[in-house]
Amino acid sequence: MKLLVKAPAKINLSLDVLGKRQDGYHEVKMIMTTIDLADRLELTELTEDRIEIVSHNRYVPDDQRNLAYQAAKLLKEKYQVKQGVSIAIEKTIPVAAGLAGGSSDAAATLRGLNKIWNLGLTMDELAELGAEIGSDVSFCVYGGTAIATGRGEKIEHIKTPPSCWVILAKPHIGVSTADVYGNLKLNRVTHPDVDQMAEAINRGDYQGICNAVGNVLEDVTFAMHPEVARIKTRMKRFGADAVLMSGSGPTVFGLVHHDSRMHRIYNGLKGFCEQVYAVRLLGERETLE
């Protein structure tokens, strides 16, 4: 059996870190939403008992470092699946960009193999398994828009934000999430109001959403990589309604309501940044269909 699965990227509209936990993870409170930028995975069932990762992107590992590989391995071991799988990954989401590309690939693998191997797992069960792989995988199983707490694995779904353009700009660097969290000093940062963002989304208040964006990790990444701060400044200057770094970076996104302004910002960033995208907010939840 062969199955094609989409793995959409996410952005953080609001991201706060509340403290460090005894297990070494950080306690977070954040709002994530999916966007119309996606990897495509082709899952092909194999008769041999092996997991194969195929990708033409040299930054995508083809072994157990790959989160899609880990997802397949987890299902095989937990449910004693004897068949193997070939996972062909067509990367569109930039790697190590703060957009959950690897986590979304893992989530898509969980959803797809649940169907191919007739495991009959619910979305909640898949999300619980996803938490064993990575903090963002649970959200990526569902997609849509949600408040994530704990280390990111506790998901509360909220309404979809009003539709708008999202301009993404990624410089030619990768950022280590562990390094960013390691340099975070919680008593020296501005904490965003995540509840205010949730209320604005539930009201369908686009201006309120723009006013409430915030990411406690921004200043840390900006200090480590000043070019990320320069992208934010440039995007603001070209007229984005709101600008924020996603996750631990280095990708910066801008929310834009009007087509003409979107084109101006997009063109103003091309050449200044290695990768620039203009996509739409998705906000739709995944299904098991």
From Swiss-Prot:
It catalyses: 4-CDP-2-C-methyl-D-erythritol + ATP = 4-CDP-2-C-methyl-D-erythritol 2-phosphate + ADP + H(+). One of its GO terms (molecular function) is 4-(cytidine 5'-diphospho)-2-C-methyl-D-erythritol kinase activity. The keyword Ligase does not apply. SUPFAM superfamilies: GHMP Kinase, C-terminal domain, Ribosomal protein S5 domain 2-like. Its EC number is 2.7.1.148. Pathway: Isoprenoid biosynthesis; isopentenyl diphosphate biosynthesis via DXP pathway; isopentenyl diphosphate from 1-deoxy-D-xylulose 5-phosphate: step 3/6. Pfam families: GHMP_kinases_C, GHMP_kinases_N. ATP binds at P94, V95, A96, A97, G98, L99, A100, G101, G102, S103, S104. Keywords: ATP-binding, Isoprene biosynthesis, Kinase, Nucleotide-binding, Transferase. One of its GO terms (biological process) is isopentenyl diphosphate biosynthetic process, methylerythritol 4-phosphate pathway. The keyword ATP-binding applies. The active site is at K10, D136. Belongs to the GHMP kinase family. IspE subfamily. Catalyzes the phosphorylation of the position 2 hydroxy group of 4-diphosphocytidyl-2C-methyl-D-erythritol. HAMAP family: IspE (MF_00061). This is 4-diphosphocytidyl-2-C-methyl-D-erythritol kinase. The gene is ispE.
